[in-house]
Amino acid sequence: AQGGVNMFLQGAIGGWIQPEGVPHTYDYANYYGSSLGKYAYELTKNKSTSKNIFFTSAKVNFPLANPSFQMLSKAGIIKRDFGKTVSSEIAYFTIGDACFATHPGESSPALSLATKSLMDNKGPKFILGLSQDALGYIVKPSFFDMSNKIPHSEYLTGMSIGPATMGIILSTLQMLIKN
């Protein structure tokens, strides 16, 4: 143990993308995790500090298109009121050259990449999924059009609050980043 302060940030967690060409074994997972830890530790040797910290956030009302969330709320399974809209929060912040954006649910790769494209910094870009909320899967609106025949779209949209979610997140982040 090296001591020090640790901070865990949930990354962009959505997407069913599995690595190809690597062993799916405990030994490989242990090797991969140990290698990542050693690399992270090496980065601390050249650390820098910054007093440049910025934070902004916005309350957002998302339209609720999935009645399942309302049923789960009425049954007491989800301890939250779901009406025609659901209120949440989105944040954007910087620490030095690093930028961070939050998504209030499980981020799809498309949402994460679109969010990173909004960030105009030269430093690292971080997407924090399931931040401030857990509004289910956040998928592209095209997933809600069943005529597109996107694999697993029926399941994915069944775990989402609705097709407007991704666009609202991106427009909110764009506003937060520009201000």
PLM regions and their residue ranges:
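Non-catalytic substrate/cofactor recognition surfaces at enzyme active-site rims
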Residues: 1-179
